[in-house]
């Protein structure tokens, strides 16, 4: 793909990057809403519920720099696609098969790992696709 085509599609690419981030962040928000049901269905106590919330954030924050380096080494697009696949697959499998709070905590940690792949990949793709004079606007959106 030549530079002119990439430049012409930069706003579409920004939309896809934004959607990718929304997908990963919605995983965190939706769990908040589901906590009462998780407590009832899994018999989780307050400590386990807290870990269900925090496992994602702790792994995401701890692995963000490492996964950014992985994306630099193996490619931005593969990192983005792998991260989205991990988040989506683990979400689907957890919803279908999780029977204990420990399963959900482990799954949330894996989702945090996938999200840690997505975040730096989206930002690095935006930096490559947008010219310097438009990068601030693109990152702000």
Predicted region positions:
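Transmembrane-helix bundle of Major Facilitator Superfamily
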Residues: 2-141
């Amino acid at each position: 793909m030549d530079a002119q085509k990439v430049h012409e599609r930069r706003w579409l690419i920004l939309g896809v990057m934004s959607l990718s981030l929304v997908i990963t962040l919605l995983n965190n928000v939706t769990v908040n809403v589901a906590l009462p049901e998780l407590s009832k269905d899994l018999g989780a106590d307050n400590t386990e519920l807290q870990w269900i919330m925090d496992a994602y954030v702790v792994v995401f924050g701890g692995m963000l720099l490492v996964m950014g380096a992985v994306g630099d080494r193996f490619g931005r697009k593969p990192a983005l696609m792998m991260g989205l696949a991990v988040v989506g697959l683990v979400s689907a499998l957890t919803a279908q098969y999780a029977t204990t709070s420990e399963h959900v905590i482990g799954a949330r940690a894996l989702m945090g790992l996938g999200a840690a792949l997505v975040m730096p990949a989206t930002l690095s793709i935006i930096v490559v696709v947008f010219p310097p004079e438009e990068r601030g606007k693109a990152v702000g959106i």
